[in-house]
Swiss-Prot record:
Binds to 23S rRNA. Forms part of two intersubunit bridges in the 70S ribosome. The keyword Transcription regulation does not apply. Pfam families: Ribosomal_L14. The gene is rplN. One of its GO terms (molecular function) is structural constituent of ribosome. SMART domains: Ribosomal_L14. SUPFAM superfamilies: Ribosomal protein L14. GO terms for cellular component: cytosolic large ribosomal subunit. Belongs to the universal ribosomal protein uL14 family. InterPro entries: Ribosomal_uL14, Ribosomal_uL14_bac-type, Ribosomal_uL14_CS, Ribosomal_uL14_sf. This is Large ribosomal subunit protein uL14. Keywords: Ribonucleoprotein, Ribosomal protein, RNA-binding, rRNA-binding.
């Protein structure tokens, strides 16, 4: 579960390497987010020459969490790291490549472009 002040690895080539969560979107008292949730974050580490710069405020969708997510069949999906993909206002990714696997739960949240760019969908 991702909450305020959580640091996430960025799983795309938008130029950001690490982001810090400012807010989990979806309600005024929402405390935590899981796979497929949108967060507002600031860029803490960035590569030179990238699309996004350090200290930019961006929106991102969570694609991997250590705590995992429960599926309808009762199974759980967990990853080794917490990661997100930076998105535009229309929920399309800012980068052109996605690194690492993403969860199947992203299909339900209108993130098909991220699912199609990902090398592996678990």
């Amino acid at each position: 579960m991702i909450q305020q002040e959580s640091r996430l690895k960025v799983a795309d080539n938008s130029g950001a390497r690490e982001i810090l969560v400012i807010k989990v979107l979806g309600g005024s008292y929402r405390k935590t987010g899981n796979i497929g949730d949108v967060v507002v974050a600031t860029v803490k580490q960035a590569t030179p020459g990238g699309v996004v710069k350090k200290a930019d405020v961006v929106k991102a969708v969570i694609v991997r969490t250590k705590s995992g997510a429960r599926r309808a069949d009762g199974s759980y999906i967990k990853f080794d790291e917490n990661a997100a993909v930076i998105i535009n206002a229309d929920k399309s990714p800012r980068g052109t490549r996605i690194f690492g696997p993403v969860a199947r739960e992203l299909r339900d949240g209108d993130f098909m472009k991220i699912v199609s760019l990902a090398p592996e969908v678990l």
